[in-house]
Amino acid sequence: MPPLILHNVPDDELYVGDDGIQRPFAMVFPQQDGSLRSRKANLETGAFGKSTRRTRSKAATPAKREDPTIAAADKIFSNWLASQNQSAPQTSVPAPAQRKPNLIPSSSSQNLAQGHDESSAPSQTRFFRKQEPTEVILRGYRNAQHQYAAINHYEQIAGRICEDYPREPPVESRRYKSELRDPAFTHRRALTPEERAKVNRAMSGEHWVKVTFESAEAADKAVYSSPQLIQGHLVYAEYYKGVPPAQDEAIPDPSVAAFGAALSRTQTLRQRNRGSFSLSGTQEAGGPDASPTSSLTADTGTLASGVEISTSTSNTLNGGAAAGGAEKSQDDEFCRVIPTVRKAKLLPMEEALLPAPTFTQRIANHIPFLRWFNGAMIGSEVPRTETGEFDWVRASLFWKLMWWLDFLLGLFGGDIRDAEKDDKED
């Protein structure tokens, strides 16, 4: 029986003849009992369903070689750790840190385990450490209305204060009328029994208040950083010993107080200078003949002496006012921004200059014939008397000529000759 020829078969099933040449088809001989050779199912892999040829070779992954230097170092450190463990007394080791005795731990794992134990020990101690609320007195601020500033300031630099006192100014003095921005309302948490017991013992005065810090460390920070300058006052933090402070008073900062005193003295001098100016002006208005004793009785000499004292005082003030006025006039003469530039002085309206004539007007004024017809000779209106009649006294030759032309020829309709006609037309 002739063999069966199959086309479109995989490459590994193509027929290879006795001459060693591969044919483009497969041949199935009767000896195979009518069954083809077993085929391996090729999975369609790769991008876009491309098939992977089984003939493609893949580079084998080389075996991982261990560095002999690292292996020797690990052996040395593991032996040293084993000797240390044998010499140390047997202690209870937590279950996660136990290892099987037949396995020798590496140096890196031992170092990591030791570092983890060392770092976890203080963290566990710190986590289980109980915080003790501590009471502190804040004293020295301006008044009870400014208590919020002291509490807010010390809470920021030291730590949380358990009391729910306000940390912001009153609502009426705020720009935004809201209670939600106050930390006393936004960052509150439940109090512990110890904190609640100390918070309930509230004590305060006009210039001091007792507060409770959540821990002794926060109280130590507040006392160590005391005093603090708050709104021009020195606010002290002291441990509460069961009694209020000896003095309930504000403690202003000396530097701020000195600056305020200097400022008040400056304002007093300015008021005195203003009073001297007004006093000198009053005396000048009274005149040189005005007698200061005219309004006083002459029964006693005390009044006269008082008048003399007031007169001498006024003279002294006048002298100081004159000196101050000279300095003020000298200061007002130059600009403040550019001291070398003098200020422009505004003259009164009466001293304003009239507009100067132009060059053409000056030439026309020198010519007699043309000068007759300018505004100075003709004027801006018909010259009339108070009764409305034509004023022959003040009228110039031009207006006299115009009156005759209007009277004889009626050139202007009688407007120049009769003023009543002008009023009727108006």
Swiss-Prot record:
Which UniProt keyword terms apply here?
Membrane, mRNA transport, Nuclear pore complex, Nucleus, Protein transport, Repeat, Translocation, Transport
Question: Would you tell me the protein name for this molecule?
Answer: Nucleoporin NUP53
The cysteines covalently paired via disulfide bonds are: none
What's the entry's take on its domains? Contains FG repeats. FG repeats are interaction sites for karyopherins (importins, exportins) and form probably an affinity gradient, guiding the transport proteins unidirectionally with their cargo through the NPC. FG repeat regions are highly flexible and lack ordered secondary structure. The overall conservation of FG repeats regarding exact sequence, spacing, and repeat unit length is limited. FG repeat types and their physico-chemical environment change across the NPC from the nucleoplasmic to the cytoplasmic side.
Feature: compositional bias, Polar residues:
84-93, 104-113, 270-283, 291-318
- Report the function annotation for this chain: Functions as a component of the nuclear pore complex (NPC). NPC components, collectively referred to as nucleoporins (NUPs), can play the role of both NPC structural components and of docking or interaction partners for transiently associated nuclear transport factors. Active directional transport is assured by both, a Phe-Gly (FG) repeat affinity gradient for these transport factors across the NPC and a transport cofactor concentration gradient across the nuclear envelope (GSP1 and GSP2 GTPases associated predominantly with GTP in the nucleus, with GDP in the cytoplasm).
Subunit comment: Component of the nuclear pore complex (NPC). NPC constitutes the exclusive means of nucleocytoplasmic transport. NPCs allow the passive diffusion of ions and small molecules and the active, nuclear transport receptor-mediated bidirectional transport of macromolecules such as proteins, RNAs, ribonucleoparticles (RNPs), and ribosomal subunits across the nuclear envelope. Due to its 8-fold rotational symmetry, all subunits are present with 8 copies or multiples thereof. Part of a tetrameric NUP192-NUP170-NIC96-NUP53 or NUP188-NUP170-NIC96-NUP53 module.
Membrane topology summary:
Peripheral membrane protein
Q: Where is this region: Disordered?
A: 36-69, 84-129, 270-329
Q: Which GO terms describe its cellular component?
A: nuclear membrane; nuclear pore
Q: Where is the signal peptide?
A: none
Q: What is its main location?
A: nucleus
Query: Known Gene3D superfamilies for this protein?
Result: 3.30.70.330
InterPro entries xrefs? Nucleotide-bd_a/b_plait_sf (IPR012677)
> Biological process GO terms, please?
mRNA transport; protein transport
Q: Which organism is it from?
A: Chaetomium thermophilum (strain DSM 1495 / CBS 144.50 / IMI 039719)
Q: Where are the FG repeats?
A: 48-49, 259-260, 412-414
Keyword Acyltransferase assigned to the entry: answer is: no
Q: Where in the cell is it found?
A: Nucleus, Nuclear pore complex; Nucleus membrane
